[in-house]
UniProtKB/Swiss-Prot annotation:
Its main location: membrane. The chain crosses the membrane at residues 27-47, 58-78, 101-121, 145-165, 208-228, 242-262, 274-294. SUPFAM superfamilies: Family A G protein-coupled receptor-like. Glycans are attached at residue 5. This is Olfactory receptor 10H28. Disulfide bonds join 98-190. The keyword Chloroplast does not apply. The keyword Transmembrane helix applies. GO terms for molecular function: G protein-coupled receptor activity; olfactory receptor activity. Odorant receptor. It comes from Mus musculus.
């Protein structure tokens, strides 16, 4: 990192919940704490159920395990710090800690998006090219897809962190967000390169997300076309049910992201902006294990079976 950044600003203030009345914060803290704990527990239960149920040792559930890991790490990077700030009057974060939070949040966030693409591709191959499924979705092939997803997320996280923290911050050190968010940091930057860097950051942030969304949409166009060719209603329903949980998570993932990043800034108060930012950082990870466990019959049965097995072992 260049020395000028350290000489101008050595720490940032996360404004986040500072504007909220103190009476509201304990209730919000309890709500977000419960959602955070449920997110961790839900994803761990999913991973444990897949690990113990040999019938679920398939590519689709391997990708789901990788997705659960990315969600746990994404949540751990953001939520504990947010909860700590809600009950503290000292909401400063050091320059290095801010850079680390930016890197890891974007790494795990983009890894999550890439894994959703991989899961969509898995469903496309299973439904549209079933005869080639085992060849295309071998253990080595699945491992490569997961590795590429993590590598892609890490590359984007590293690129954004390097770009942002090579800027000069000299206007203010107050970040109007609950975390070190890239666009909130750009507002604090000054210098001749800021406008150019802003355009570059937008391209780096938006292009992969649009690419992922387009790939998922194309996958489902082919999937729906293949399902409509199935003669029986029961067959169509059974085939589509294998995609329902993934499609729902994609809609939630991109739906909340669109609401946050495409909304008009002038229409919302600081309270609303802060609460809306938590929909993507807290609420979306909270919903994901619920959707997968409720809308996936095999996984739901595996979780129930694992629960009964543990209860029986403890009662003996």
């Amino acid at each position: 990192m260049p020395g000028q950044n350290y000489s101008t600003i050595s720490e940032f203030i996360l404004f986040g919940f500072s504007a909220f009345p103190h009476q509201m914060l304990p209730a919000l803290f309890l709500l977000y704490l419960l959602m955070y704990l449920f997110t961790l527990l839900g994803n761990l239960v999913i991973m444990a159920a897949i690990w113990t149920e040999h019938r679920l040792h398939t590519p689709m559930y391997l990708f789901l395990c990788a997705l659960s890991i990315s969600e746990i790490l994404f949540t751990v990077v953001i939520t504990p710090r947010m909860l700590s700030d809600m009950l503290s009057t000292h909401r400063s974060i050091t320059f290095i800690a801010c850079a680390n939070q930016l890197f890891f949040s974007f790494t795990f966030g983009y890894t999550h998006s890439f894994l959703l693409v991989v899961m969509g591709y898995d469903r496309y191959v299973a439904i549209c090219r079933p005869l080639h499924y085992h060849a295309l979705m071998s253990l080595q092939g699945c491992a490569r897809l997961v590795a590429w997803s993590w590598a892609g997320g890490s590359l984007i996280g590293m690129a954004l962190t390097i770009i942002i923290f090579h800027l000069t911050f000299c206007e203010s050190n107050v970040i109007h967000h609950i975390l070190c968010h890239v666009f909130s940091l750009l507002k604090l930057a000054c210098g001749e390169r800021t406008a150019f860097v802003t355009i570059a950051v937008i391209l780096v942030c938006v292009t992969p997300l649009i690419g992922c969304l387009v790939f998922i949409i194309l996958s489902y166009i082919f999937i729906v076309a293949a399902i409509l060719r199935i003669p029986s209603t029961e067959g169509r329903h059974k085939t589509f049910s294998t995609c329902a949980s993934h499609l729902t998570v994609v809609i939630v993932h991109y739906g909340f992201a669109s609401i946050i990043y495409l909304k008009s800034r002038g229409l919302y108060s600081q309270y609303t902006d802060t609460l809306m930012s938590t929909t993507y950082t807290v609420f979306t990870p909270f919903l994901s294990p619920i959707i997968f466990s409720l809308r996936n019959k095999e996984l739901k049965n595996a979780i129930i079976k694992s629960f009964h097995r543990n209860v029986c072992q403890q009662s003996i």
